[in-house]
C-alpha cells in the first residue's frame, strides 16, 4: 500500500519541502508516502473559478489509478483523533489498496473529486494554510504508524 497526497498547489517554500521530507524519510519502506502536486490554475480578476476548480479536479483524479481509495480532506469531513487515524491506517493497510489523500486549492475540491471520495477527513475546523497542511499530514501519518508499531514517538 502506498499513500499519495494529491494536492493542488506547487512552488512551496523550502521549509515546507524540508518538513514533508522529514516525515517521509522516517516512514518504513513498506509504507511509502508520496506527494503529487497539481499546479494551481491562475485566478485572474475575471477568471471562471468553477471551470478552474473542475480542471484541477480532473488533474487530481488523473493521479488516481483504478481501484485506489480516495480520501478527501474537507472542512466538513470527519475529525479523527490520532488513535482513530491509526485505526484507519490499519484498515487501509489490510485493504491493501493505495490511498489518495486529496487536498484542493483555495476554493476547495471539485465536486467530481468529492463524489468519488470513500472517506471525508477534517484536520480541523480551522482554515489551515496549504503549506502547513502538507507537513501536518506527513506528521500525522508518521505518528499513526508509530502508534501501530509501538514506537515511543507517540506518548
Curated annotation (Swiss-Prot):
Annotated function: Specifically methylates the pseudouridine at position 1915 (m3Psi1915) in 23S rRNA.
EC number, as in UniProt: 2.1.1.177
Similarity-based family: Belongs to the RNA methyltransferase RlmH family.
CDD domains: RlmH-like
One Pfam family it belongs to: SPOUT_MTase
Transmembrane parts of this sequence: none
Protein name (record): Ribosomal RNA large subunit methyltransferase H
EC class of the enzyme, as a word: transferase
GO molecular function, one term: rRNA (pseudouridine-N3-)-methyltransferase activity
